[in-house]
């Protein structure tokens, strides 16, 4: 069944609503809301950075207030090399998430992102990847390695791997071919028909616990087949998200991705998530309404990427309410990204609004 989009009105136009949101932003236990975001790549760090900065502004020091659940299927670049040579899980996405959770002016940001420019076997590797590799070898536990590095650099939240098992992506393509590994999937020109994980992994128990105890769960923007779905395909993750009482938010992508989602609309993204998980997972779908700069859009178009269109009638949204906000930002006229602070404010407001109360306010960011 198709559900029409319901358009809210303006939160800033209703002075009383601001006090209400502030009052309900802390739950019955008097603590800050616990928000869990799932993903990988560049989208998850943007969500975590905004949430952590907003929590710091509110003087919220709860280590469970912001949690990132990161994919472990990357098999390219430095992460892929260390994974193959050392037998560890890929460290790159976890590194980026940890750095998003520390102070913007921390000296560790530049240090852990620094790529070594000489030396046999280490050229091109970020220092943070090597530190995570060393800690993983020392502790014998990749999640413990992430925790220890986070403690060293002053992380303002948690980063958890979705699983500790050595898992690979497998895609059945529309051409009939089957390809294995994230790099091969992105590099093939044929669209993906079906994605799976091999071998079928068990979730990290702490990951499921974080979802169960969350006040808000965010599926962050990013590569549909290589960043969004890998977490949701792990045994028990989608079912847990479907069954919890948390507010569940899907952040729609700004642009399509060459090699994965050419010409996909928002409804196409939602259809793929539903068909792979078997659930309508979301209470809210957060959509950018800010027009994309023409020059930036042309640069993306030259690479085969275009804005993700949000149809007026979404057939695969279930009962989710679509909320439109100004979320996009152009960096140097080249990269189109979600603005971390605007995104965090919208997420916090939706979590505060709850899942059973229909929104009558628009989120002005």
Which role fits each region the language model picked out?
Residues 2-5, 61-64, 70-191, 344-353, ...:
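Electropositive, gly/pro-rich neighborhoods at or near active sites that engage anionic ligands
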């Amino acid at each position: 069944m198709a559900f029409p989009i319901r358009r809210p009105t303006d939160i800033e136009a209703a002075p009383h609503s601001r006090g209400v949101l502030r009052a309900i932003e802390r739950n019955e236990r008097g603590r800050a809301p616990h928000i869990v975001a799932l993903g990988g790549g560049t989208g998850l760090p943007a969500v975590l950075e905004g949430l952590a900065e907003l929590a710091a502004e509110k003087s919220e020091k709860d280590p469970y207030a912001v949690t990132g659940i990161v994919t472990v299927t990357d098999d390219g670049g430095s992460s892929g090399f260390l994974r193959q040579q050392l037998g560890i899980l890929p460290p790159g996405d976890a590194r980026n998430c940890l750095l998003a959770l520390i102070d913007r002016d921390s000296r560790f940001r530049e240090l852990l992102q620094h790529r070594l420019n000489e030396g046999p076997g280490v050229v091109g590797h970020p220092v943070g990847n090597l530190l995570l590799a060393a800690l993983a070898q020392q502790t014998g536990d990749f999640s413990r390695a992430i925790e220890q590095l986070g403690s060293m650099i002053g992380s303002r939240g948690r980063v958890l791997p979705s699983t500790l098992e050595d898992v690979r992506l497998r895609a059945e393509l529309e051409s009939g071919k089957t390809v294995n590994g994230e790099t091969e999937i992105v590099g093939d020109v044929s669209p993906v028909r079906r994605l799976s994980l091999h071998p079928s992994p068990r979730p990290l128990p702490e990951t499921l616990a974080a979802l169960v105890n969350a006040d808000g769960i965010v599926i962050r923007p990013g590569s549909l087949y290589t960043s969004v779905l890998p977490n949701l395909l792990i045994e028990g993750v989608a079912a847990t998200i479907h069954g919890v009482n948390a507010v569940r938010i899907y952040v729609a992508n700004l642009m399509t991705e060459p090699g994965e989602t050419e010409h996909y609309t928002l409804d196409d993204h939602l259809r793929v998530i539903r068909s792979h998980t078997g659930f309508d997972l979301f209470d809210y779908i957060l959509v950018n309404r800010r027009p994309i700069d023409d020059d930036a859009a042309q640069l993306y178009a030259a690479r085969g990427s275009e804005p993700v269109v949000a149809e007026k009638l979404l057939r695969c949204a279930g009962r989710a309410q679509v909320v439109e906000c100004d979320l996009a930002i152009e960096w140097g006229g080249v990269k189109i990204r979600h603005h971390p602070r605007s995104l965090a404010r919208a997420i916090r407001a939706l979590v505060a609004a709850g899942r059973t109360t229909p929104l009558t306010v628009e989120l002005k960011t």
